[in-house]
């Protein structure tokens, strides 16, 4: 599967790209996981992918490395709905890999994506999902949650922003795990689904969804 995004590539659209074999992005591609704006978290594998792409590699390379700085980056990108201003920045944020291509002229991305698909098809085998994802556990989650409280005390985040961000922190760190460990991708995917369904039951999430549909702007409640 080769994805060929251009322009706004947000939420589920980005999650399609994250799980493609290759992405061929236009230079002016604006990527972001912005689900918190409607009171939800990325639950199409987006939260899991941020842990897999931003946290797992440095911990594989140096197991004794403190995970918090890498988790902080993944957490902030989701909880603050950060959006890349270009495909180059999307690569810096982990939305694109070094193997993904950036095509500066958007008129050429379909032909470039077709070439990539044909190249990949020669001898293609589906990717294996044997690799595990680093889950930092409860202690590191507590540090992220303290950051959430600090944002609330400074009036940079509402009470419900904190609820949503808490779900993000829980998924990224592996849920109720007491100790850091490597877990299957499915572990984080189940946590994503659980958080998404829990938030979908909340009235304030409904208010955020309705506001975006009616006004085109996110509601802070």
Model-derived features: positions:
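Receiver (REC) domain switch/active-site residues of two-component response regulators
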Residues: 21, 96-97
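Glycine-rich beta-to-alpha active-site loop
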Residues: 1-38
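Intrinsically disordered, low-complexity segments enriched in small/flexible residues
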Residues: 57-82, 86, 92, 98, ...
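Catalytic binding pocket for nucleotide-activated donors in carbohydrate/polymer assembly enzymes
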Residues: 32-34, 45-48, 52, 94
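Glycine-rich phosphate-binding loop at the start of an alpha helix
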Residues: 11, 44, 84
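Conserved P-loop NTPase nucleotide-binding/switch module
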Residues: 41
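An acidic, glycine-rich surface segment that forms the CoA-thioester-binding/catalytic face
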Residues: 1-6, 46-71
């Amino acid at each position: 599967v080769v994805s060929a995004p251009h322009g706004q590539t947000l939420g589920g659209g980005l999650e399609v790209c994250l799980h493609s074999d290759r992405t061929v992005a236009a230079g002016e591609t604006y990527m972001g996981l912005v689900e918190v704006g409607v009171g939800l978290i990325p639950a199409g594998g987006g939260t899991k992918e941020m842990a897999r792409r931003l946290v797992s590699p440095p911990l594989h390379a140096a197991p004794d490395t403190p995970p918090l700085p890498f988790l902080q980056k993944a957490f902030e990108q989701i909880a603050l709905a950060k959006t890349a201003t270009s495909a180059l920045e999307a690569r810096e944020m982990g939305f694109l890999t070094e193997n993904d291509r950036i095509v500066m002229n958007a008129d050429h991305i379909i032909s470039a994506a077709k070439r990539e698909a044909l190249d990949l098809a020669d001898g293609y085998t589906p990717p294996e999902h044997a690799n595990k994802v680093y889950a930092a556990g409860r202690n590191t989650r507590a540090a992220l949650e303290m950051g959430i409280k600090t944002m609330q005390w400074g009036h940079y985040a509402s009470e419900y922003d904190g609820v949503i961000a808490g779900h993000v922190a829980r998924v990224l760190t592996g849920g109720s795990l007491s100790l850091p460990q490597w877990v299957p991708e499915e572990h984080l995917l189940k946590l994503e689904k659980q958080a998404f369904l829990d938030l979908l039951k909340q009235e304030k999430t409904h208010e955020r969804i309705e506001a975006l549909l009616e006004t085109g702007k996110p509601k802070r409640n």
